[in-house]
Amino acid sequence: MAIDIWDSDAIKELAGGWTDEEEQELIKDTRLREFTVEYLGRSWQDALKYSFLSADETNSGRYLRNIHMGDTIYCHIAGYGFLGIGICTSKAVYMKDFNVSVDGVSTPILKAPWINQDKKDQLVTEKEIFIGVDWKKSVPDESQGYWEKGMTSIPLVAYMLNDRTTHRKVAEHFGYQPEE
C-alpha cells in the first residue's frame, strides 16, 4: 500500500535532486555477491563471443538488474548444467543501448553479426536487457555443461543461493579461483 503513495521521483525532486549514478553509489552494497543466471533459449556461443548475458525484463528477467559490476556469475542452462563463470562488467541496460567489441570497434549489439542469428531475431528488442560479463572459465558448447546430483538450480533468471555448495562444486569443476 505504501508503494502506491510513495513517489520516489517526487521525493527526489523535493530533496534537491540527484543523478541515478549518485543514487546507485549511495545504496551500493560493496560486498561482492555470487549469482546464478539461467540462460535457456538464448545463444550461448554469442554470449561467449561478445561477453554478455541477457534476459527479457518481464517476469523474473528483471532480476538481472540486481547484479552489480564485480559480482560473480555462474551461468546455467536447464537440461545442460553450468556452462561458465564470469565477472559482471556492466549494469543491465536495454538491448538498444548495449555495445560489444567487433574487430576492436565498439558496436551496438543490434548491429553485431551473431553466430546464431535466429536466436538474436527471437529477442524482443524493447524488453531484452544485457549485462557485460568477463568470462573467466567456460565451455564452448551447451552439451559440455556440468551438473551433478544434489546441485541446486531455481527457475528464475538471476538469483543468489543461500547454500554455496553448488557454486563451490562448479568453481572446483572449472578450476576457478576468484581473484583477490
Predicted regions and their residues:
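Beta-strand cores of modular interaction/reader domains in eukaryotic scaffold and signaling proteins
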Residues: 74, 87, 132-134
